Each structure stands twice: as structure tokens, then as C-alpha cells.
Amino acid sequence: MNVLQGMAAALTPLGLLWTAIIFGVSVFLHELAHYGLARAQGVRVNSFSVGMGPVLFKKLWRGTEWRVSLLPIGGYVEIDGMAPVEDADGQWRLPTRGFAALPAWGKIAVLLAGPLTNLLLTLGLMTVSFTSQGIPALDRARIESVETGSRAQALGLRAGDVITAIDGQDIPETRRVGGQEAAGYEGVRDALAQAGRHTFTVERAEQGQPVQTRQVAFDWQPTVNGQRQLLGIRYGPDVRQVGVGQAFVTSVDTTVRAVPQLVGAFTGLFKKFFTLDISQDQNVSGPIGTAEVISRAAALSPWALVQVATLLNLSLAFFNLIPIPGLDGGRILLVLVSALRGRPLSFQQEQAINLGGFAFVMLLTLFVVVRDVSRFF
């Protein structure tokens, strides 16, 4: 299978369509927030583009040129007073009107609007998902299926049974594994990696019957004659049904808990970038990897797509707040530096910083794309 065949197998037409929709809507709302906060402070927005690249269609409305561009991979807004202006002598200088004339807090409000919108989308999508589908109960391992003829079937385990304790110890919400926080229900796997006698406390809820609790004890050897042994179950976290309020609280908690993971993921990406290490990991995907994940989610269920959209918006919010010139976080940093100095940076200083930041972001994007494509060689 050549490279193009491998990519075609990974990226389905429906998946590509959903990728364009999810990514396009997320970036469109991000840019719309910048637009709204600028207009709310009396700053003109020269153009608003849905998509990138060559303009396919444009229309002037309310002082803004609204564009539809060729590539459905995002969008942008051109806010008056953000870009350098050329004077009558052909010299470029920093603007003094529009965005440039706003106080520091006003500029930060415009710049923060985009990432905060993605964050609110994250919380909103997560709240809807938790309200409809329930929240994961990480302290309970729900058996999803039992293989016919397996050891688990012989022990009387069934799909729908819930393991609540292992060897007399209640399963915790989370546990530490190798210095990292892991879900408690995954302790089932750890138990099955150890030889000896194990006891699972199992709850079974028959329809219309009270919950039954029983102890399932068995002797276990992880390997026999060099062959890995399998209990014969597929399991995941149990689910608790909650109302909107609890779903929102859980969404906030989940988002806060995800921040250290995002920091670690992007730190790892930057290390790989600076060392030109294109080896794969599961932490950060480029556009092709993201489209592949969305293709798989589209084949599963609408709720799988909601989960991917949630993660994408959280990643967009976090990435845009990284203090790299050219990103919202970098622009906010420059505003703060100017406020602390009591005067703006010179035209040459700001241009050099922004050009360096833009080049870094473009090279990082190219690196991620190359790393994505390298999987198919």
C-alpha cells in the first residue's frame, strides 16, 4: 500500500466532511468573538473570512468585507489598528487608531475573546454530553462484554456487571501510576498482571430487581507456558446519570484536570520540534491525525463526534493562549509588556517579534504535518 492509499484508507469522505464542519465552526466562532469584542468597543473590522487562501466570494456588510475562502481550515479577522500602516512617504509605522487606541484592558478583552469562546464551547459540549450520556464513574469498572468460553464466563461474569472493589479494596476515583494520574477502574488490569488469588466485588442490577452484590474469587496466572492469559472481558468506566448542574460542575473539573496533560503534550511537541524528532505519540495530532480521529468517531456515533469536538475546542483554546508572538497569547504578552513599560514597543521591535513568532508557528505546523504523513511510509 502506497502513501496515498494509506491516507485514503484512514480518511473517509464522511470523516473529512465532519472535520471541515467541526474545525470550521470552532474557528469561525473563535474569530466571531474577536469581531464582536472589537465592534463592541467601536473598532472597525475590515474583513472577516470563513476559510483561508484565495477568496471565492465576498460581500460588504456593516463596514466589514465578509469573505468565503477556498480552504475550509479556519478563518481570520482583520481588525483596524492591528496591522502596520504605510504613511505618505512610503514608510511603515505602527497604527494609532482602532485597536491600537484601545486601553490595555480593551485590547486584552478582544484577544481573549477567541480562546474563551473555545473554552465555553468545551464546557457547553461537555455539559450536554454528560447530561445526555452520564458522567464516567472512574471508581467502578463496568463489564461491556464477555467472550464465549472464556474464564470470565466460567466465573459467571456477564456484560453489565460492575466491579466495585478488587481484593477487598474499593476502587478509587484515580490512582498514581509511574508518577502519572490514572483512572481507578484500570486497576482491574493491574490486578490481572499479578499472579495469585484475586477477589472481585461485583454488582449486578437485574431489571426490576434490587442490586445484587457478590464476591468472585479465582486463582490467576498472567502467563502459562509463556502464553499470556486473558480473563475474557472488555470493560470501561461505569456511568452515573446526572442533572445539568452536576454535569456542568463535572465539566469544569474535567477541564481543569486536563490542563496539566495539555501542558505536558505541548511541551513534548516543542521538544520533538527542536530536536527534529518525528516519532509518533498519542498526545498531539496534526490536521491529518485529527481528521483520522474524526473519521473514526463519525463511524461510531454522534456522541463520539461531540467528544472529539470538545477536545478540539479545548486544544484550540489552550494553544492560542500560549505566549508565542502571532498567537493570541503572544499578542496579550506584548500588550502587557507595553503597559508595564508605559509606552508601546517600536515598530521595528514589534515587527521583528511578530515575524519571528509567525515563522515559528508556520514551521511548527509544517513539522506536525510531516510527522502526520510519516506514519504512512
From Swiss-Prot:
A GO molecular-function descriptor: metalloendopeptidase activity
One GO biological process term: proteolysis
Residues at the active site: 31
Residues noted as binding Zn(2+) in the record, renumbered to the chain: 30, 34
Transmembrane segments: 108-130, 303-325, 351-370
Any one Gene Ontology cellular component term annotated for this protein: plasma membrane
SUPFAM superfamilies the UniProt entry points to: PDZ domain-like
Membrane topology reported for the UniProt record: Multi-pass membrane protein
One of the Pfam families matching this protein, by short name: Peptidase_M50
Keyword Membrane: yes
Cofactor(s) needed for function: Zn(2+)
InterPro entries per UniProt: PDZ (IPR001478), PDZ_6 (IPR041489), PDZ_sf (IPR036034), Pept_M50_Zn (IPR004387), Peptidase_M50 (IPR008915)
Family to which the UniProt record says this protein belongs: Belongs to the peptidase M50B family.
Protein name per Swiss-Prot or TrEMBL: Putative zinc metalloprotease DR_1507
Natural source organism: Deinococcus radiodurans (strain ATCC 13939 / DSM 20539 / JCM 16871 / CCUG 27074 / LMG 4051 / NBRC 15346 / NCIMB 9279 / VKM B-1422 / R1)
